[in-house]
């Protein structure tokens, strides 16, 4: 959350879920969003699929998308593609805006996952090494600027799950709190109880590049362990 504007920059889906559960509060990590150390990337979807060329074609045709197919090359901009395989680059003929492209990426992900293939999320820069990996199909998503993320958040529009990837100086993890604390207390009481709760846990500082729960992070991690 931006410390100045209090705009929720990441985690809107979790925030909405808490609201539906009747929570009055939510734990938040406040950041100076204009800090140059804070960067924005994206989460690409990686699959190890059987017959990826046919699967990509079937996914796009099932969603009534008109596309052109070109040979995959290191010179291609991966963020402009809709689906990439090790042989082909599938790109829409009529390119929608960034938000629509994100929504389409999620629909394609659901289609391919529905064919019993497991999706793995990795940073956009992982696509440069993927030709040497087991993955053979990638669904890229556009990369938003900070200004675009702020504009989207303040307009009330919601980006799909796991699209933006924020890189912050230090990322807290394991801030697990009982729902009771978020529902039945005032802000002052909830903050005091949260402070005591986190102070009672062991803090494990992990260096950039560490993996937690199958996800690799570029920033330092502050993991609150039970």
What residues fall within each predicted segment?
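A short, basic-hydrophobic beta/loop patch
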Residues: 1-7, 13-48, 167, 224-226
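Alpha-helix/helix-capping structural signal
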Residues: 12-13, 144
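Short, surface-exposed beta-edge/turn micro-motifs
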Residues: 5-6, 79-80, 133-138
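A C-terminal functional module that forms or caps the active site or interfaces directly
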Residues: 115-121, 168
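Short Lys/Arg-enriched alpha/beta "domain-start" segment
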Residues: 75-115
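Amphipathic, charge-rich alpha-helical segments that serve as recognition/docking helices
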Residues: 32-89, 148-161
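Long, compositionally biased intrinsically disordered regions
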Residues: 104, 126-188
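Charge-dense, extended regions
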Residues: 166, 179-226
């Amino acid at each position: 959350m931006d410390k100045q504007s209090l705009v929720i920059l990441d985690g809107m889906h979790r925030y909405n879920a808490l609201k539906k559960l009747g929570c009055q509060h939510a734990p938040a990590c406040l950041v100076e969003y204009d800090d140059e150390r804070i960067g924005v990337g994206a989460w690409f979807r990686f699959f190890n699929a059987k017959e990826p060329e046919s699967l990509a074609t079937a996914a796009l045709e099932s969603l009534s998308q008109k596309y052109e197919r070109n040979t995959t090359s290191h010179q291609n901009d991966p963020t402009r593609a809709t689906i990439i395989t090790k042989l082909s680059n599938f790109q829409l003929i009529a390119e929608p805006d960034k938000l629509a492209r994100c929504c389409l990426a999620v629909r394609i992900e659901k289609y391919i996952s529905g064919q019993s293939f497991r999706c793995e999320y990795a940073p956009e820069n992982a696509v440069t090494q993927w030709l040497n990996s087991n993955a053979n199909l990638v669904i890229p998503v556009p990369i938003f600027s900070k200004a675009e993320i702020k504009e989207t958040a303040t307009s009330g529009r919601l980006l799909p799950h796991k699209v933006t990837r924020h890189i912050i100086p230090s990322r807290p993890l394991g801030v697990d709190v009982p729902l009771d604390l978020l529902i039945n207390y005032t802000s002052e009481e909830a903050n005091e109880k949260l402070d005591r709760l986190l102070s009672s846990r062991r803090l494990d500082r992990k260096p950039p590049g560490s993996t937690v729960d199958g996800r690799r992070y570029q920033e330092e991690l502050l993991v609150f362990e039970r």
